[in-house]
Amino acid sequence: MTDNDSDVRLAHRLAEIADTLAWEFFGGAPAVRHKSDGSPVSEADLAVEKALLAVLAAERPGDAVLTEESGSLGTRSSRRRWILDPIDGTIPFLAGERGWGTHVALEVDEELRTAVLSRPTERSRWWAVRGRGAFTSVRGEPLSAARPLRIPSAPLPLEAARVGGFLMPDSPVEPVRDRMRWVESSVCLVGDLLEGRVDAVIDEGGHVWDRAPAALLVHEAGGRVDDLRGGGRLDERWLVYAADGVADGLAGLLRDVGA
């Protein structure tokens, strides 16, 4: 097994541990406190993070880690960094709703190499390896049974594009949503893009741990990742994931409205 294959298997193992442990809390009443920005963090988030960090400490003791709850851990000189969101979607998780899961990504020399994104309520998992493609699989299936993903690339008028997003209050995008076919809700918008159910996803104000798996998945599936500044940085205010045929038109509209 190559180092890359070992990392892929470890990323899936981390996702499985997170999904299993989170499921034990799901539908219950885990203790909750609020962070300085007002967002909730529950004992489930912290328990999952603790379990993942323990695995990485044992399996990859020299690797750095970035997590939503604990921030940056490990040595800054490490070439390798794991990026974790133990429970992405804490609000729907606490409400007993769908739309939550685990985000796992690995960076090597500041380049995303491996990504796993899960939605346990759907038994769905999307994953990617740089240079080897993006895939989807059902939780519990062997990786060899995974289905490859490819985002359609045909040109598409913006008014016909199915677009969803994570927008901040008073977002400049709100007044122009009617210029496209806006998707109001989804269990996993990025998963919908990867599987052809939407054509673009707008992420306003997301964090690196929210975005890292999605960015590699979309890239490896043949889509575009655009920070509206000519690159694909994960720490900018805006990040757009899109099918190639709609990416330029959508980015142009967002720049026109001041994004």
UniProtKB/Swiss-Prot annotation:
It comes from the Bacteria. Its EC number is 2.7.7.24. InterPro entries: Inositol_monophosphatase-like. GO terms for molecular function: glucose-1-phosphate thymidylyltransferase activity; inositol monophosphate 1-phosphatase activity. Keywords: Antibiotic biosynthesis, Streptomycin biosynthesis, Transferase. Gene3D superfamilies: 3.40.190.80, Fructose-1,6-Bisphosphatase, subunit A, domain 1 (3.30.540.10). Pfam families: Inositol_P. It is an enzyme of class 2 (transferase). It catalyses: dTTP + alpha-D-glucose 1-phosphate + H(+) = dTDP-alpha-D-glucose + diphosphate. GO terms for biological process: inositol metabolic process; signal transduction; streptomycin biosynthetic process. Belongs to the inositol monophosphatase superfamily. PANTHER family: INOSITOL MONOPHOSPHATASE, INOSITOL-1-MONOPHOSPHATASE-RELATED. This is Glucose-1-phosphate thymidylyltransferase. It comes from Streptomyces griseus. The gene is strO.
